[in-house]
Curated annotation (Swiss-Prot):
Homotetramer. May play a key role in the regulation of the intracellular concentration of adenosylhomocysteine. NAD(+) binds at residues 219-221, 253, 282-287, 305, 340, 361-363, 409. It comes from Mycobacterium tuberculosis (strain ATCC 25618 / H37Rv). GO terms for molecular function: adenosylhomocysteinase activity; NAD+ binding; zymogen binding. This is Adenosylhomocysteinase. It is an enzyme of class 3 (hydrolase). It catalyses: S-adenosyl-L-homocysteine + H2O = L-homocysteine + adenosine. Its cofactor is NAD(+).
Amino acid sequence: MTGNLVTKNSLTPDVRNGIDFKIADLSLADFGRKELRIAEHEMPGLMSLRREYAEVQPLKGARISGSLHMTVQTAVLIETLTALGAEVRWASCNIFSTQDHAAAAVVVGPHGTPDEPKGVPVFAWKGETLEEYWWAAEQMLTWPDPDKPANMILDDGGDATMLVLRGMQYEKAGVVPPAEEDDPAEWKVFLNLLRTRFETDKDKWTKIAESVKGVTEETTTGVLRLYQFAAAGDLAFPAINVNDSVTKSKFDNKYGTRHSLIDGINRGTDALIGGKKVLICGYGDVGKGCAEAMKGQGARVSVTEIDPINALQAMMEGFDVVTVEEAIGDADIVVTATGNKDIIMLEHIKAMKDHAILGNIGHFDNEIDMAGLERSGATRVNVKPQVDLWTFGDTGRSIIVLSEGRLLNLGNATGHPSFVMSNSFANQTIAQIELWTKNDEYDNEVYRLPKHLDEKVARIHVEALGGHLTKLTKEQAEYLGVDVEGPYKPDHYRY
């Protein structure tokens, strides 16, 4: 380290004032702290939880390893967890999503300086390689005292959970399987990390798995992984599916996306959206936010869907429902939002208009066939960070690809705004408290937060926006068969 600038050429943690970390530049901490203070005013859910729980310290003793986009909003979450008594180590869950000033602010802490940081260990910087990303994930899960490993995981996308559970699985098998030639590049890096670690430590991940009391998962893709682990009998600790809390999925996924998709495309391309033909792949909560955002800009929007219910919803909102093959040749902008893989393949990319824009807002980079594009012989010119112009020599057509097929709203912009993330992160904090303080009540299965906690999060934010809720009379509550104070809807209610 030279001055405050952290070099990442050597993958070893930096240590200052007893804190190990690896970030871009500690001198950015003051800028990060200023933005963090503004964000706190826009995150009433987290600030309310600080006021409610600061004295009782419900997370005292919790050692939380967190894998979630290292943004300003996440910085407020991290400092909420520590304010409630937890110790925390952090890494980002995406190679492009870190806001370097936010990472610096968290390491330095509210009472430290770059020369004497007093914050939280963070291992994240914008523009990591895959090798750096998985190295950082391991550092986040590796606590200084081997006798006091992580005992809670806070995850987004399931990478931290997968690292622990797959690592334990391979340790018990006595071997890390070899990568196949056609495996994705990231899977090869993942297996190599586990293989290298197994050579020096035969039970690292097993010890961590046995210590972990639970995991709380932020996003749709990570929840899918959790259910797959549970179905296979491989889930070694309880999990709370935060994503399917109503105040997460119906707000973060839809309204957050509605804001940040446009921001990412504007910052990445400066292209006018109005009047353009836009194809949104997927019409779940995220896809709905995308389609609504594009419609609001005056675009002509079409949607692809596998589910007839979602497809009918799209048509009732005025969107054409088409197949990729039908629409790809006419689309000016294509956005994938399915949570699935192999949505836009090389043959689709080759059929796109000259200078059409292609991006993804699903969690992983496998919705767009980036590997096929890289093998195609197309030439790549980097226009600016996370904006690439790919040109096919046989046709002369060029395609603008955002964030290398990864989350464009975080790679090209700054992600979802603070207020909507306050909903999601309030749920995360409550879920961490729930699993930590009531661990005996949970088996190694996937759970959702109870309805009354969902309503609690919503109530905080309604009041913050100046709304006034109507209060049921006792007679009205009896008529509906609910309590005066709620919950007001059954679990099967679809908001």
